[in-house]
Amino acid sequence: MGITSAEGVLGGAAGGSWLRMKFSEALLLVAAGTLGGILSTAVSIASLVTYPALLALGVPPLSANMTNTVSLVLTGAGSVLSSKPELTGQGRRVIRLGIVTAIGGAAGAAVLLLTPASTFTAVVPVLIGGASLVLLVQPRIKGLSPSAGGGNKMAYIVALFAVAMYVGYFGAAAGILLLVVLGMMIDESLVTVNAVKNAVSGMANATAAVCFALFGDVRWAFVVPLAAGFLAGGWIGPKLVRKVPAGPFRVAVSLCGVGLAVRLGISAYR
């Protein structure tokens, strides 16, 4: 039997081995993962690209979210490794807060697994729209943070747990929310707080990914190219962000997010 194209060599079902995936599908996922990794580095909203890319390839909404979460695990590990200098002396704090976020991530995953798929489909447009608006007003939100160490510590722990649950459930723009909450709790430089955020967010994402891998419908065929893209984007992102004006970039991404939310909302509610 003759082979006429790379797509013919790699053609196969979405649920099979990634080696059998169509070349065009793999290319789309690598590209989406790369852009998602850049957005994750810049504005903490990788799902704005990768989630609709999975939907475009015919993956059901619930499975797309689970697949996206599993693919992000290596990105979290990479961000922690790259933040080792800033995490020096933060080990106990990361473990203490990481326990909270790990449990929260698992709880968010449990909510996703135990509720109907139709509920997730209906809620996602709201989550994406809300995340896009949070991104738009990000500087003002950060400006509202009180001095670290003040206020009710238990209230901050509850807020941290709630955001970690959101990480496990969907997670778009969760990094922004985590940065705000941790900024209230930790009396350190923004660079250090961001490094702690990367670590504890990675723990929430990891426990959610384990739950999805064990009990959910992860499309493993799509995980490898998407994860490869995330790794590439995570490396490119910091270099690119230094050269792009933050304000216009944030507004453009926010508007795209609102547009995506409207599109998904029309599809979900019609």
Locations of regions flagged by a protein language model:
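Hydrophobic alpha-helical transmembrane segments in multi-pass integral membrane proteins
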Residues: 162-172, 208-216, 223, 260-270
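Residues within membrane-spanning alpha-helices of integral membrane proteins
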Residues: 26, 69, 124-128, 132, ...
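Transmembrane helix exit motif
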Residues: 77-88, 126-149, 259-270
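Selective hydrophobic functional segments
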Residues: 66-119, 205-248
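Cytoplasmic-side transmembrane-helix entry/capping segments in multi-pass membrane proteins
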Residues: 90-100, 124, 147-153, 194-200, ...
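Membrane-interface alpha-helices at helix entry/exit sites of multi-pass transporters
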Residues: 59-69, 91-96, 187-198
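Selected transmembrane alpha-helices and immediately adjacent juxtamembrane segments
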Residues: 11, 15-60, 145-194, 201, ...
